[in-house]
C-alpha cells in the first residue's frame, strides 16, 4: 500500500505495530479521563483480521510525530454495502479543526479508492472540535452509544447482595456460573464464539455486522487485557448460554466491560444480570474502584441492567455516516 498523500501541513507515514503505543499516548493526552493502554493497542495493531483491511499512519508535522490516522473497511465479499471507517487523532497542542479535517480528507480518499460507498466516523459526544469537523465534511449523526460508570466503593454492598441473589436464582434454575479458567470443556472457546456470533447479530446497528472468525475471537480471549480467571460464562449442561468479561488494562486505563451476551433461549431469565454481577463482585475483591461500560442507546435490556446496578451515565459516543 502506498502512503496517503500529505494534506495541509501534515504528512502521513505508514505505521507499524511499534507505533501503537504512541497512538495510545495521543488518545490519552486528548482524553485523560479515558486513558488508553499502550500494551493493548500494540497487541491489536499486531494482529491480522480475516475479514477486515486496515491502513494506519503516523501523522507528522515538520518531521515530528503529532498524531495518527486510520482507514479500515470490511472485505467487500463479506460486507457488500461497502462501509469504510475513517479516524485519527492529534496531540492537544496541534489539534485544530483544520488538521482533523486534513486527516479525514486523506483517510476518506483512501477508503473511497478501495471502493467504499458509505463513510463512517466516530466522535465522543463532548468532542466539539471533532463533531464540528465531521459536520462540515457532510457527515450526519446515525446512532448514539451510551457510556456508564459504576462506583464500586459506593455501591459495594448493593452489588454483593445482587450477586448473592443472582447466584441463588441461577442455582435454582440449573444455570452454572463459572470462569473460563475453571471450565474443562475442550470446545468451550468455540461454544462461546458461536454464542457471541448469535448475540452479535441482535445488537442494534445501522452498518451491517461483519462476522467474526473464530481465529479472531481466540486472539481476543488471549489479549493482554483479558484474563481467563476473570472471564465469566453461564452453562446449562453442555451448552454455553452466556458470557460477560471485564477488560483489565495492563498499564493504564479504566476497567471496562468488553462483552456481555446471552443466548436467545435464556434472555429475560436473569443470566446477563448474574454474569455482570459476578464480574463486578470480582473487581471489588481485586481492589478496583470503578468500572465502565458502553451500549447502543437502543439496547434497552442491557441499559436497564446497568441502571439497576447503579451505573451513572457519562459522555458517550456518536456514529456519523456520509454517502460517497
Where are these regions (language model features)?
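Short amphipathic alpha-helix that is part of the acyltransferase structural core
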Residues: 1-44, 52, 165-211
